Amino acid sequence: MDCTKDYCVKDISLAPSGEKKIDWVSRFMPVLQHIRKDFEERKPFKGVRIAATLHLEMKTAFLLLTLKAAGAEVSAAASNPLSTQDDVVAALAKAGVKVYAIRGEDREQYYEFMHKALDVKPNIIIDDGADMVSTVLKERQELIPEIWGASEETTTGVIRLRAMEKDGVLKFPIIAVNDSYTKYLFDNRYGTGQSTWDGIIRTTNLLVAGKNVVVVGYGWCGRGIAMRARGLGATVIVVEVDPIRALEARMDGFLVMDMMEAAKVGDIFITATGDINCIRKEHFELMKDGAILANAGHFDVEISKPDLEALAVEISEPRPNITEYKMADGRRLYLLAEGRLVNLAAADGHPAEIMDMSFALQAKAAEYIKENRGRLEPKVYVLPREIDEMVARIKLASMGIKIEELTEEQKKYLESWEHGT
């Protein structure tokens, strides 16, 4: 482990490998490239301190370097102990980002590193799962006067932050980047859909076609996972608690069951709910021999590991990132990536082209917080529609796509109430 006052990484000599990774993904992130060019010229974050808790891999690295190029002092820690890529973190440290993260860090190190990142006394926080905001509110209240606001990347994080708002404990404004159209319609659906299966297939090297895939949760992430499972030839079963989403899943052509019924027939189970213990003891007891369990939600609580451990008579690791739990009756259940985010713990996360839009939003959210400091209440906000549309237009242009424009006649018609039947 290489540590100084400005970084703590596994091995700083890994930096050249990380630099190559960052350079590769940057070529497929035209929206963030566009914003970076603008930021480099204007330096909107000169003198601004930004602390981030993110999955520290190549796409997030390009975001952090974009903010640094904009003049910010940037610090960062991991948002998940297993998603860190050590070579990328080394490259960030070499580039002058104050970064503290090591793949496989334990819980104590996780929070120690987060506190180190917070020692920069941030004006802006970029969060992924709301752990950094929560830590500030509970343990680092002395930082609050310096904080103008924070942005949140994930559905899980936004749920936590809205709960904080409801309880009246928020002390600064939050921008829910996750709730922007160019985030959840693309990142959550197409990004999660592809990267979750990338993680599962890389880890298991098993066939998906012909299997029963149980998707627990039919939000935008669940929709993407189910869509790609069908494309791979699986029979897809959706488990939901929301009657409207359950009905939508059925109308989309998927089977819908409760968890007890799905547990009996599933070959691969994937959770994407943001809630706790969605698959637990009574479900494990019904599963087939060889059932595979994976999680696509932010925290490792959706599949009950304590229940698996209590039921198992033997625990082993047949392959990297796979834990085998042997039951008393001889059945074997396989948990991928310790129940953590399978797409990041067992693969490289979302495709660069998808994160291009999400991280463009994060960069603009940071600028929005700076420009509106002192004018926003301690509430959860969504970015203005014009920022969403700006990101979409730049993305379309990078794809060589030109869209139609309303004529003046059409605009006038849409604004009028006088024309009827």
Swiss-Prot record:
It comes from Thermococcus kodakarensis (strain ATCC BAA-918 / JCM 12380 / KOD1). This is Adenosylhomocysteinase. Its main location: cytoplasm. The gene is ahcY. CDD domains: SAHH (cd00401). It is an enzyme of class 3 (hydrolase). HAMAP family: AdoHcyase (MF_00563). Keywords: Cytoplasm, Hydrolase, NAD, One-carbon metabolism. One of its GO terms (biological process) is S-adenosylmethionine cycle. The lineage of its organism: Archaea, Methanobacteriati, Methanobacteriota, Thermococci, Thermococcales. Pathway: Amino-acid biosynthesis; L-homocysteine biosynthesis; L-homocysteine from S-adenosyl-L-homocysteine: step 1/1. SUPFAM superfamilies: Formate/glycerate dehydrogenase catalytic domain-like, NAD(P)-binding Rossmann-fold domains. One of its GO terms (molecular function) is adenosylhomocysteinase activity. One of its GO terms (cellular component) is cytosol. It catalyses: S-adenosyl-L-homocysteine + H2O = L-homocysteine + adenosine. It holds the Pfam family AdoHcyase_NAD. It comes from the Archaea. Belongs to the adenosylhomocysteinase family. It is found in: Cytoplasm. NAD(+) binds at residues 154-156, 188, 217-222, 240, 296-298, 343.
